[in-house]
Regions:
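Major-groove DNA-recognition helix of helix-turn-helix-type DNA-binding domains
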Residues: 15-51, 58, 65
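Short, amphipathic alpha-helical "recognition" segments used to contact nucleic acids or chromatin
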Residues: 1-6
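Short aromatic/basic micro-patch
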Residues: 7, 51-52
């Protein structure tokens, strides 16, 4: 039986984009502070951990790829 997660961590998003987790964190910081950024995804926080909705990440990847 396979369980598909509804949320992605920084590491998962980085893997999908071919970037590093620190790049994802940096983009989140820039977005939060109104600076120029490329990663246009809104994180949800579970406790203090930023998580990204899987469907939104996949839509972003498709938009960037095509």
């Amino acid at each position: 039986m396979s369980v598909e997660l509804a949320f992605y961590s920084d590491k998962d998003v980085a893997r999908r984009l071919g970037m590093s987790p620190s790049w994802v964190r940096g983009q989140r910081h820039k977005r939060k502070h109104g600076q120029k950024h490329l990663l246009d995804l809104e994180p949800r926080y579970i406790g203090t951990c930023a998580r990204y909705v899987r469907a939104e990440v996949e839509a972003f990847v498709a938009k960037v790829a095509g």
